[in-house]
Amino acid sequence: MDSEYAALLERAYKLVAPKAQRRAEIPKIEVENMPRKTIIPNFGQIAKRLNRDVYFMAKFFQKELAVPGTLEGDVFTLHGEKSPKVVEAVYDRFIRYYVVCPVCNSIDTELRKEGRIFIMRCLACGASTPVRPL
């Protein structure tokens, strides 16, 4: 009985697809410091991979860091010198507040505005969660 059960269990594991990893891993942010400027060259690519509006992300960074910024293509320039650790901490906060599903911890989410409220909908589990406004 035990060997038959083990054989059936092994067969079942072979038939079932392996557990899927996250559809997309969280991309790393690149930070370059210049005199009186902080440049994030892969900002547009990050926004695209996270399925977020690049202007929404830029507004979040500007408010959190309290500095103005300009967006030219994929490059986001902050007009103030900030350390890479501070920028990475703000990026991690953005991920936590506006990207990761609080129910299943998936990053496969979309953000949409319904009236005055931003709603984050998880594409993995289907949960809809209101998020704090900018």
Swiss-Prot record:
InterPro entries: IF2/IF5 (IPR045196), TIF2_bsu_arc (IPR004458), Transl_init_fac_IF2/IF5_dom (IPR002735), Transl_init_fac_IF2/IF5_N (IPR016189), Transl_init_fac_IF2/IF5_Zn-bd (IPR016190). Pfam families: eIF-5_eIF-2B. Keywords: Initiation factor, Protein biosynthesis. The keyword Protein biosynthesis applies. It comes from the Archaea. GO terms for molecular function: translation initiation factor activity. The keyword Oxidoreductase does not apply. eIF-2 functions in the early steps of protein synthesis by forming a ternary complex with GTP and initiator tRNA. Belongs to the eIF-2-beta/eIF-5 family. Heterotrimer composed of an alpha, a beta and a gamma chain. HAMAP family: eIF_2_beta. This is Translation initiation factor 2 subunit beta. It comes from Pyrobaculum aerophilum (strain ATCC 51768 / DSM 7523 / JCM 9630 / CIP 104966 / NBRC 100827 / IM2). The lineage of its organism: Archaea, Thermoproteota, Thermoprotei, Thermoproteales, Thermoproteaceae. The gene is eif2b.
